[in-house]
Amino acid sequence: HRMSVYSQKILTETAADTGVQYEQNSKGLLYLYRNPEVLAAGSEHVSLLQEAGQELEIVGKERALEIIPELADSQDQLAGGVFSPTDESGDSRIFTEQLMEVCRSMGGTFESGVSIEQLDASGTEIKRVVTNRGVFSADRYVLSLGAWSPLLAQKSLGVRLSVYPVKGYSITIPVEKGHTPPRTGGLHEEDLLGFSPMGDHFRVSSVSEFCGYDLGHTPEDFEHILKTAKRLFPNAGNYDKVEFWSGLRPMTPEGTPILGTGRHSNLFYNTGHGHLGWTMSCGTARITADLIAGKTPEISTELMGVR
């Protein structure tokens, strides 16, 4: 939670400094509940977060419908929810692409189509990165390969990272004339479904599956997401033109990322963000930059190091 709050601050600063636009929606997020008893149980966790400084509001059905009036068609299945007015949503791909252009304008370079074959080390330092497009050498290196981080670390360095691939699925629904997607994003806590308005598209994600590095998917894999999305928001978009996607979340047992150096003093880890990759991205990037520059990060990374 501490990392997520810090990262949101850095993301906001980054967006303001660079001017990147990414279908950002600053109307907060609503966490929905169908069962009153489950909502009551969830309220206990809300108290802990409120004590930690998080702005949260426990809401009944009427208030939930004020926040997301598009839930009217499924209000008979709505007990209430928890509203976080400071949370935001947006399109992470657009954010990343625009930030890449900002970096290029500052002299940064990006190499596409490059596969890392080996990290060469001597003693406690990384000396070079061997790829299919040649050898790259630098003073400092950052290992940030998502779910593939542990494969390279183990193969090249014999370092075992507690990062495991967990497959998630999402659908993107085009919003056409006459459609009424929710204007505020959120999550359905019991159906384990996240939803986010993105301009002329509406994205819904769900499911966690342990299947190694398999990226394939079948129509059956999306049945739960489609069924629940249609039940909650029947007029959100054109469900006949849905785009399907699956990807791997780099999960750690504790749910916290792995940051800092290990046995190699010039290799900085920034991986294991799980399902909160974009949420924690700017914060962990700032921390990594601070560590590379020899600065003390603004927040502690205790218990987030390589073990």
Describe every region a protein language model picked out.
Residues G60, S112-V114, E243-W245:
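Short loop/edge segments at beta-strand edges and connector loops
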